[in-house]
Amino acid sequence: MHGSGSLLACLLPPLLLLGAAPGPAGALSEEEKHVMVELHNLYRTQVSPPATNMLQMRWDEELAAFAKAYAQQCVWGHNKERGRRGENLFAITGEGLDVPLAMEEWHHEREHYNLSAISCAAGQMCGHYTQVVWAKTERIGCGSHFCEKLQGVEETNIHLLVCNYEPPGNVKGQRPYQEGTPCSQCPLGYHCKNSLCEPIRGPEEAQDLSSLVPEAPSSLATEASSSRREGIDSSLATEPPPFLVTEVSGSLATKVLSSVETKAPSSLVTEDSPSMATKTPLSLATKVPSVLATHSLLSLDKRPATLLPKSTHDPIPKSADKEASSTRMPSRIPESSLHPKISLMGTREPLPLSQEEGEAEAELAHCSEILASVFPAQEKPGELQTTLKHKGHSSSKSLSNSPSASATANAVGGRTLALQSSLPDAEGPGKHGFRSGSNASPGHVGGLLLGLLLLLPLVLAGIF
């Protein structure tokens, strides 16, 4: 029995490393979702001049599922079926998706936007920025996907990020927000928090949270409770970790016995059979960092996440967040890669004309009208207006296949393509282009296979 425990101790670190590696699908982690919401709210509090009616942004799983489904199509262009949803796009080559870089690229457009005139500088784009700081938008959901081939782009192996928003921004003739004293015009039912209008939540908020957390399969809950009873000392059950108490929904908690509330990593007990759990030494179970043991209950692709290093943040800023704040890991902003990267950025296409619903002031104009009010006019229908920048000089071109470099991308040795949305009848996969000599991302499948080959001798040694 002791030998089996030693084998598990040897196998655990490489297994955790494999689990931490991003998969081919490139789904957003819980920490990335949290960072996305936090950066949106940070930039919304930093608008200058300040806003009187800026609502607090929160995560929406339905929007996230919608964005994920479109990202999986691997198309470099806006979703024509998005209805009354705002949309921002971003794509990048390299080792993985860089959420802070995407947000920085979108926010960088503020330098070209004139709030008083409700206009954007000639030859520039501002649609990303105005959507990020649109005061009446309060829900966001994003999805990402690793595309070996992105339709409409010549480069391969690209991480595509799609974010959808409700209510949508970039409405013709309207300012992103009203300038003045922060929170002085918060809607009824909202109160001020960090210069943002936050909804006043009641006791029923915990019940609302449970509806957003997918229930675990009954077989998984039974296996978890069985293995934990057999393999974990009952004395540990007296100290349930806070993140299990505050962030697991009521519907899920009723399916798992009270012995679930232990310090043992959930990834170990849900993946191993009961017999394996009985052989795991207690010292091993308690030494694994809890950040590696947290379980993603809000996976975009609805699959249970296991053996992945995730934050304990719930991406939806609800009342439970206050109780769990002491256990949350700090947001970590990924450092810029030393390898050259290529990032692509797509503006939020003006909203299509649709049926009247929601607020009266959110009436949407025809795409061509909104295009004229938000973005500079194009020389020909269907052309993409981009700006090509290099360190030695700069030039502005209106081309359907031209890269655009930003200062941020240059700082990390890469280039950025900004997608200027064309009119709906001219939009198509062939209308958006991308060219670059920068390197493509390393093969994700090759790295995973190499790790599995390294683990095979260890597993065989433990069996025989």
UniProtKB/Swiss-Prot annotation:
Return the Basic and acidic residues bias intervals: 311-325
Keywords, ordered alphabetically: Glycoprotein, Protease inhibitor, Secreted, Signal
Q: Which SUPFAM superfamilies match?
A: PR-1-like (SSF55797)
Cite a single GO MF annotation.
Answer: peptidase inhibitor activity
Report the PTM annotation.
N-glycosylated.
Task: Give the glycosylated residues.
Answer: 114
Q: Name one GO biological process term.
A: negative regulation of cell growth involved in cardiac muscle cell development
- Start and end residues of each stretch annotated as Disordered: 208-241, 260-281, 304-347, 386-412
Q: Which GO terms describe its cellular component?
A: extracellular space
Q: Which Pfam families match?
A: CAP
Identify its protein family: Belongs to the CRISP family.
Q: What PANTHER family would the database entry show? A: CYSTEINE-RICH SECRETORY PROTEIN-RELATED
Q: How does it assemble?
A: Interacts with PSP94/MSMB.
- What is the protein's known function? May inhibit cardiomyocyte growth.
What protein is this chain from? Peptidase inhibitor 16
* Native species: Bos taurus
